[in-house]
Amino acid sequence: MEPLRPQITYGPIEAVNNEELTEADMLSFISAAVNSTGLIGYNIKSFDDLMDNGIPQIVKQMFNVDITYKDQRDHTEIDKLRESVQIQFNFTDVNIERPQHRNYSQGNKINLLPNKARLCGLSYSGPVNLAAEVILTAHYSNGRQEVKRASIPPFQVSTFPIMRGSNRCHTYHLSKTAKKEIGEDPNEPGGYFIARGGEWVVDLLENIRFNTLHIHYHTMQQGNNEIIRGEFISQPGGAFENSSQIIIRYMTTGAITIEINSTKFSKLRIPWYLIFRMFGMTGDDSIIEQVVFDLESNSPVNTFMIEILEKSIHVSDPIFQPVQHELNREKIIQFLSEKVSKFVSNPSAYKSDENAVQYLNERQLTILDKILLPHMGQTADTRVRKLRFLGLLIHKILLVIMNVFPPTDRDSYRTKRVHGSGVSLAKAFKAIFNTSVIAPIINGFKELLKQTAFEDLTQRNIIEAFSAALSKNSASDLNRSMEQSIISGNKTIMVRQRPIVNRVSTQSLERKNLLNTISALRTVNTHSTTNASKQTERADMMRRVHASYPGYICVAQSADTGEKVGMSKQLAITANVCTAGEVLSLKQRLLSDPAIQQLADVSNKDIVRKGLARVFINGEWIGCCTNAFELAQRYRMLRREGKIVHPHTTIYWDSMVDEVEFWLDVGRLTRPLLIVDNNIEKYNKACYKAAEARKKGDKDWEKHKIPFIQNTRFTSQMAKDILAGTLTLEDLVAQGICEFITPEEAENCLVAFSITELRKHKHDVTRRFTHVDVPQAILGLAALVSPYANCTQPARVTYETNQGRQTGGWYCFSWPYRVDMNRFFQFYNEMPLVKTIAHNYVIPNGLNTIVAYMIYGGYNQEDSVIVSQSFIDRGGFAGTFYREEKVELESDIESFGKPDPLITKNLKPGANYEKLVDGFVPVGTVVKKGDIIIGKVAKIRGEKDELNKYIDRSVMYGFDEPAVVDAVMRPHGPNDEIFGLMRLRYERNLNIGDKMSSRSGNKGIAALALPTSDMPFTEDGLQPDLIVNPHSHPSRMTNGQMIETTVGLANALQGVVTDGTAFLPINVQLLSERLAQEGLRFNGCQKMFNGQTGEYFDAAIFIGPTYHQRLQKFVLDDRYAVASYGPTDALTGQPLDGKRSHGGLRLGEMEHWVLTAQGAMQTIIEKSHDDSDGCISYICRNCGEPAIYNASHPIYKCMNCDVQADISMVDSRRSSIVFQHEMRAANVNITSVLSPRVFQPA
């Protein structure tokens, strides 16, 4: 039988003509990749996979409950004969519907739309319906069994959070017009969750690759004699199945131990050879052969391995000393059962019963079959395969010990996976479902069997017990816990008073602009470990850019300061995250391939002696082949056809260990690359003919030679078709022009950095490229916003990726229908004159400002900018700032309305109630500090006084900045409680102290608003909008901004928009010619006049348009935070922190250093102590106890000393006094010792 080979043949590469293809045309390939998957399509696809496959698979397959417990009921004679009861149930149907909401006024359920959930503080969750089969079996002492069965019809158990835009969302497949009608942004892709009215994003989370051995040297610590360890997490399937971990350790004593981590297995380091003996392989030679493969080989590596293994077998272990030399597998299994089994409380009690011992042994083996390397199989007939695989793992660890191979690179994406929202929520769902649903059902049945005789049970009793167990608190527990896992961000959440590790990493979605929203959805977080927070070499290495990042992780975007540097990353622009593929069909295809010998047909000796390569699929060892390179290449060609092998299949040949790996698991990063074809076969034949002709003495032997050619089949016409929308990425994949490559397979590729590099080596046979890349693909969306980023210092590009997410703009198009807290909506936004490819996917967030690079007075130092007052008056960076006020009616006694002063007490002094109409200030009204904006009163229960029926609980506006009431709503909450919701609007023009930034990360602060009459101007009368200090560029090396200004100047004069995407070629000569055509100097500098004196400047000034963005850091919001007054804590009197509570600013280290350097220590004391919670306390000198002081009536009194008291005033702090009160409440007295009085002579 011939191996399966590709059927499609491609035309000769010599016939491909793409000389007209430019670097700018290659950008269309990025557009095709983004248009195919969408910037966040992987996130929605991951959640859809969870809904369609994950939740049904978890509930149906992982929660088949089968427990037996001793019957405690003894009311009748039949009860006394009943020994035990077996409870079995499994779920037969799982269905998750679209979100619904109970309409309390009509008493029915209606569809819950996303905006309704936002306004009403609801959670966008869909009902979870389950159906089940229950079997109850009673076992009697006389051997009789009695069975009761019941089918549970589908009913709602709880609700599950639904992702906006998924196939369970009401906006799924809606047109833009339909989205507008329901108050949604028509261009919004979704990908986030709405929980309790807030929007939350589940981050992509890094994880190690399962079914892969990760080998690491272990740091020698006190009490730990471990040298090296290999960790292996085995997972059958590829997405939602349970996993099991084993840890193989090599100790300083020479021992090799295996630790199995499972809930059904106690943690214990078992000598490795006992695992082999327990599964029936008792001979030492047979055991060692599974590791070294060939005992007869005399190679130095083989000899050294045998020495290590023989020594490890004879190393004594105190715990396993009784079975160290035991060859009887039954005794070994029984000994392990006593040590590590969890399913029997006292295994040693069964030693006298042979039947019980046999049952325990078989049960132990059955458990081991399921938890030991389950990806290799979970039945008894797969034990030999597992032992061979376990031997291979130990073999690889020994190779690392001998320095033949290096340990695993922890930071390489070759051995990592990125798990999306589907996998993260599945992990949380497993633990929460077990605690909140399964446990109550079991307890419900136990309670039923305790109260009702088994023979009296009916199908109705069983159904009612099943439903009652879930109708109490389970529904709310499951829903509340899933919401808590998304909202809290805590590492541990409580479910039914049980702590559960939270596997979900989330962040609140702050809609500052569209770029910020997309960046939040493309965030990749690394697990926060103890190593990450330490100042160690490991903490530094895990934050660096790894060689496997380019093309998959943006090499520029991360946090610029703090612990998240290098730990919070972004996907590159073309990177995508794969869901799990169909493993079974590919496995069957590989096993039927004649080139692959199945594992059972290959002996260990043949692997070494015949030089066979191992073949794996999702980490499962399925067989061997003779030519690994040919096998990998053949299946890659089949993948290009897309009929037999899925296009997203990873095919990797590890040449160091000669293994071929096929991966279809979830979480693989992938990106499209253009394929490079060549004529190597023709070239080799021609060279062979030329060599033969030369041997025969043919003088014209060189005529047989042909040039080597390598090229891509991508042409400029295809680039035009992509931009026209007639050609897609799927078409390119189907035509064999591009394919998807993962970080593993990238190690088998030689990728040309650009089309220019490919052409440079077009005829170089020593550098045969497999693919050609687009240079811009190494950056993410936020980094691609920066023009000519390759000319700017990388650190500045990193700053821009963070500043670009803070800029003001249009945060969404549905803003009139939303009520958001602290949102800025900028009025005028322009497309930049020098745009980048990123602007095809995000709306603009800035203005083309005329910038003069000069020193003009003392107000524009490096970090400050002079702004033209005329620019501010024309609406430059002007916008609207929104706040919300939300008030809930806490009980039936509260109501909205204008308080009547005749029957309401506790009215706020000095407050203005006149603007209230039906409890709310009307829309369009200007409110100022002291105005009541929401009127609320509460009826006093039991009050008989007609003049004091109500108490005032109104909300007063407390800001100095006037506001306009923009919207007023009265939505109903989840329990039909009424809210008062008000949106306030503020005009936010550019003020002194506000921040702005260019797209090159050059940030500046508005230091002076200069009148138009004082601004400098050119000979043509052009005045700059901003004056930037030229010294800010040499130190920051923002060359990209200089190029942007020069190109923007030419574009403005010629009325065109050009592309300034990073890595595009820059023709300086052509740029100078464009400026000369418009009558300017070749470098763009112009002669300018001083606006204050009217004189010429001695030097030419560089002036031109630069795209600037206003950052959402407003001085008006921070003004109250630096004052000596503001809200304080009611107990300690200290200032509150945080903007939400209108608290003060944190005094940072740099501010502290500045004040210390200036000798202003008293200022620090004043701000940190006196203005914080400073107070005067009165203490008696005689006894040291606090004294009583009344200022209005000059009373000085000590409760201990009475008239003999000697009272002194002491500078103290409110927090100190609170602490003393708490200690006295705990019956611990604190006395103060004051210094003696010093009397100075008159």
From Swiss-Prot:
Triggers of expression: Expressed in the late phase of the viral replicative cycle.
Keyword Transcription regulation in the entry? The reply is no
Q: Which GO terms describe its molecular function?
A: DNA binding; DNA-directed RNA polymerase activity; ribonucleoside binding; zinc ion binding
The entry's localization annotation reads: Host cytoplasm; Virion
Q: Which organism is it from?
A: African swine fever virus (isolate Tick/Malawi/Lil 20-1/1983)
Q: What class of enzyme is it?
A: transferase
Please report the name of this protein according to its UniProt entry. DNA-directed RNA polymerase RPB2 homolog
**This enzyme's EC code(s):** 2.7.7.6
Q: Lineage in the entry?
A: Viruses, Varidnaviria, Bamfordvirae, Nucleocytoviricota, Pokkesviricetes
